[in-house]
From Swiss-Prot:
GO biological process: misfolded protein transport; post-translational protein targeting to membrane, translocation; retrograde protein transport, ER to cytosol; SRP-dependent cotranslational protein targeting to membrane, translocation
Biological source species: Candida glabrata (strain ATCC 2001 / BCRC 20586 / JCM 3761 / NBRC 0622 / NRRL Y-65 / CBS 138) (Yeast)
Matching PROSITE patterns: SECY_1 (PS00755), SECY_2 (PS00756)
InterPro entries referenced in this protein's UniProt entry, alphabetically: SecY/SEC61-alpha, SecY_CS, SecY_dom_sf, Translocon_Sec61/SecY_plug_dom
Segments passing through the bilayer: 33-53, 76-96, 119-139, 146-166, 246-266, 362-382, 416-434, 441-458
Gene3D superfamilies, alphabetized: SecY subunit domain (1.10.3370.10)
Lineage: Eukaryota, Fungi, Dikarya, Ascomycota, Saccharomycotina
One Pfam family per UniProt: Plug_translocon
Family: Belongs to the SecY/SEC61-alpha family.
Name of the protein described by the UniProt record: Protein transport protein SEC61 subunit alpha
Length: 479
């Protein structure tokens, strides 16, 4: 059955653009150049406004997830990496439920699997672009006209396809790491930096204030006579970034770096060389930032579908159960879910909000921890890091677990790796919720994603660039 499903994508192989894998290893300096060029192209796409927009003043159901999805509203990067991540999530689900079985040992299966994911991402891009345009995000479709509506859809599809190819370029060995992680982490870092150091001023009702928390801190200390009151305002001002959020963000960043050094060291020995011993490390974050990326993609699709359905059928009881959307009382911000399933899946925002609605806090925490653990446990089967895959690597390299027989390697690894993956995913989820409670700049998930991606790039650079200084181990020792 699964073979027939994959074979359906065989005809697309002939005309679907593809990045050819390099015939030999790409030098480190060239990888840096390709990575920089890819990032530059992504940043440019995120600054080019869509041509043909009549109005972009409608509600934005994804405003708190845009940093996570590398999305900039009203630009070519409106959809960000959402279609690509969603496509990956769909195929992960199909594999995890055994509806689709792929032999990673088969070159043909791997190629068809990649083509299938790419086709799915293109279809999702078209669907999301169609929904965004036809629901009036850029003006009423009747005001836009058919030609402009089609042009907007084409622009969104073109930009998303460029991002898809850039990600493929990096993951196939021309650059460093994953394009999706790189683009998302860059967008998050840019967002955090802006909230901390933005020199723009806004009228908050207390007079003009600097938007950036650090700039506002020094400005308030300089102009206010009452320094104590100035400090309190700089650290706890509402509706604008404050210094407490900056400190919370730095704390979360350092704490995640500290946790990167946590690992279970599995003693192994060689069956080929007598007396040769080694350590096989199983990290706490065994699947890195993948669980939180997939969890964010799932949430974004739920919120998008919920708001679209509510706009069309606001009085339907089933739709209202899915989510009731409106502007939060006492604010003039974007529309948010006020009740329904979407409300309970929305990030908490702060410790105060968590205490005011403990039921939502419990449900949201359980949702994040559960989905992250599930995604992490499923991902190891797809990424080639499952107990079966590691046992195969051990056999090929002539390694066994110290004190265990060669025939029991898989059984021992099966006790450790799935548990480590699930626990690591749940830990990522717990850190995300904790960051939200602290009120860190951006969302907890975005800070975790940026930190793990930055550390991942550090590891890749250390490995390929020839320097071996272990920043995190040194940091862990200091702690």
């Amino acid at each position: 059955m699964s073979d027939r499903i994959l074979s359906l994508f065989k005809p697309f192989e002939a005309f679907l653009p593809e990045v050819i894998s390099p015939e030999r290893k790409v030098p480190y300096n060239q990888k840096l150049i390709w990575t920089g060029v890819s990032l530059l192209i992504f940043l440019v796409l995120g600054q080019i406004p869509l041509y043909g927009i009549v109005s972009a003043e409608t509600s934005d159901p994804l405003y708190w997830l845009r940093a996570m999805l590398a999305s900039n509203r009203g630009t070519l990067m409106e959809l960000g990496v959402s279609p690509i991540i969603t496509s990956s999530m769909i195929f992960q689900f199909l594999q995890g439920t055994q509806l689709l079985q792929v032999s990673l040992d088969s070159k043909e299966d791997r190629e068809l699997y990649q083509i299938a994911q790419k086709v799915c991402a293109i279809i999702l891009t078209f669907g999301q672009a169609l929904v965004v345009v036809m629901t009036g995000n850029y003006g009423s479709p009747s005001d836009l006209g058919i030609a402009i509506s089609l042009l907007l859809i084409f622009q969104l599809m073109f930009a998303s396809f460029i991002v898809l190819l850039l990600d493929e370029l990096l993951t196939k060995g021309y650059g460093l790491g994953s394009g999706i992680s790189l683009f998302t982490a860059t967008n998050i870092a840019e967002n955090i930096f802006w909230k901390a150091f933005a020199p723009t001023t806004v009228n908050s009702g207390r007079g003009k204030e600097f938007e950036g928390a650090v700039i506002a801190f020094f400005h308030l200390l300089a102009v206010r006579k009452d320094k104590k009151r100035a400090l309190v305002e700089a650290f706890y001002r509402e509706n604008l970034p404050n210094m407490f959020q900056v400190i919370a963000t730095v704390f979360v960043f350092l704490f995640v770096l500290y946790l990167q050094g946590f690992r279970y060291e599995l003693p192994v020995k060689s069956t080929k060389v007598r007396g040769q011993m080694a350590i096989y490390p199983i990290k706490l974050f065994y699947t890195s930032n993948t669980p939180i990326m997939l969890q964010s993609a799932l949430s974004s699709n739920i919120f998008l579908i919920s708001q679209i359905l509510f706009q069309k059928y606001p009085s339907n009881p089933v739709i209202r159960l899915f989510g009731v959307w409106g502007i939060r009382p006492g604010t003039n911000g974007p529309q948010v879910p006020l009740s329904g399933i979407s409300y309970y899946l929305q990030p908490i925002g702060s410790l105060k909000m968590a205490l005011l609605d403990p039921i939502k806090t419990v449900i949201y925490t359980a949702f994040v921890l559960g989905t992250c653990a599930l995604f992490s446990k499923t991902w190891i089967e797809i990424s080639g890091t499952s107990a079966k895959d590691v046992a195969k690597q051990f056999k090929e390299q002539g390694m066994v677990i110290n004190g265990k027989r060669e025939t029991s390697v898989y059984k021992e690894l099966k006790k450790i790796i799935p548990t480590a993956a699930a626990f690591g995913g749940a830990t990522i989820g717990a850190l995300s919720v904790g960051s939200d409670l602290l009120g860190a700049l951006g969302s907890g998930a975005s800070i975790l994603l940026a930190t793990t991606t930055i550390y991942g790039y550090y590891e890749v650079a250390a490995k390929e660039g020839g320097f071996t200084k272990n920043l995190v181990n040194g940091f862990s020792e200091m702690m």
